Amino acid sequence: MSWQQRVDDALTARRATDTLRRRYVVSQGAGRWLVANGRQYLNFSSNDYLGLSQHPQIIRAWQQAAMRFGVGSGGSGHISGYSVAHQALEEELAQWLGYPRALLFISGFAANQAVITALMKKNDRIVADRLSHASLLEAANLSPAQLRRFIHNDTQHLSRLLQSPCVGQQLVVTEGVYSMDGDSAPLAEIQHIARRHHAWLLVDDAHGIGVTGDEGRGTCWQRGVKPELLVVTFGKGFGVSGAAVLCSESVADYLLQFARHLVYSTSMPPAQAQALSASLAVIRSDEGGERREKLAALVQRFRAGVNASRFTLLNAHSAIQPLIVGDNSHALRLAEALRQQGCWATAIRPPTVPVGTARLRLTLTQAHEACDIDRLLEVLHGAGE
């Protein structure tokens, strides 16, 4: 088979099963409204949960830092790209979340891959929740360690897998809030089981940090859990982009030596780091608390309204509210029907989610108003008839 035939066959297979992904060009996409092709839509696909991407204080911090530092970092943090802005943000994150150290990464995907591939060796085992993010599972597959996956949030299955003999070390991998189902992991029980088997725990709290817990400290803090490795990302609750790994002093020193994504990547712009410090200040403030309260009220309003409809609603109390449709083509048609009525929603299909669980992945943000939720419910009920 030629290279071209391989490419063509893969695309043909995706088209045949209604799983071909596409990008949409938008002129505005992060806030309450999404604008595409000159039309304005209520935006129910953004992960800017607290609406901070449009916050004037954060925008101003980025602008001021860009004037001071320029628009790029100029190198890896090991060469010349570790600025005072990066150092300040790492120290603020570590203090906020109660860890000795924080290390910045350019993305959550890079952070997850860096940590897992740097730590895991040939005789080790990774035990990951079956619904873990693609970055975690891909990193596990790329590492020399054995990968075992436990049934989603099934702690008994997790325990059985950890009990089987392992020559090396074991790492349990889970998420705080799951990106496609919107539900939370039983973190306290998972941590208890991991410690009983002398395993380390890695929690990716991309969708919880900033949004849940005291001062927005996330799902782990809310549940009284302190994993050995906590990954937080900045594209959701923080409204910016990038990520950080929270860990011990020795693990941070180890990652600085062996995490290739950290060593061999140009670091995030200092202006971005300073904007993230400004975002953290908002998250920790009374204003941040008010934004979280408003978001929680909007989620409650949506769930109360949609329960009477014909859609399958998962047990999710986060900003992520998936409506399970099942059939791929039905999910696409439903998303298009909502767009025709001025509501922008995204159809999620395999391989992102398991076969037979295609869905509308609706995300609510603090930027929405109660009338927006009511309009979404009205359109959903009409589209579902």
From Swiss-Prot:
Record: residues binding substrate: 21, 133, 352
Cofactor: pyridoxal 5'-phosphate
Entry binding sites for pyridoxal 5'-phosphate: 108-109, 179, 207, 233
Gene3D superfamilies: Aspartate Aminotransferase, domain 1, Type I PLP-dependent aspartate aminotransferase-like (Major domain)
Pfam family, one: Aminotran_1_2
Catalysed conversion reaction: 6-carboxyhexanoyl-[ACP] + L-alanine + H(+) = (8S)-8-amino-7-oxononanoate + holo-[ACP] + CO2
Recorded superkingdom: Bacteria
Pathway: Cofactor biosynthesis; biotin biosynthesis
InterPro entries given in the database record: Aminotrans_II_pyridoxalP_BS, Aminotransferase_I/II_large, AON_synthase_class-II, AONS_Archaea/Proteobacteria, AONS_Proteobacteria, PyrdxlP-dep_Trfase, PyrdxlP-dep_Trfase_major, PyrdxlP-dep_Trfase_small
EC number annotated for this UniProt entry: 2.3.1.47
GO biological process: biotin biosynthetic process
Record keywords: Biotin biosynthesis, Pyridoxal phosphate, Transferase
Chain positions with N6-(pyridoxal phosphate)lysine modification: 236
Gene Ontology MF annotations: 8-amino-7-oxononanoate synthase activity; pyridoxal phosphate binding
Family to which the UniProt record says this protein belongs: Belongs to the class-II pyridoxal-phosphate-dependent aminotransferase family. BioF subfamily.
Functional description taken from the UniProt entry: Catalyzes the decarboxylative condensation of pimeloyl-[acyl-carrier protein] and L-alanine to produce 8-amino-7-oxononanoate (AON), [acyl-carrier protein], and carbon dioxide.
NCBIfam families in UniProt: bioF
PANTHER family per the UniProt record, alphabetical: 8-AMINO-7-OXONONANOATE SYNTHASE (PTHR13693:SF100), CLASS II AMINOTRANSFERASE/8-AMINO-7-OXONONANOATE SYNTHASE (PTHR13693)
Subunit field text: Homodimer.
Protein name: 8-amino-7-oxononanoate synthase
Classification lineage: Bacteria, Pseudomonadati, Pseudomonadota, Gammaproteobacteria, Enterobacterales
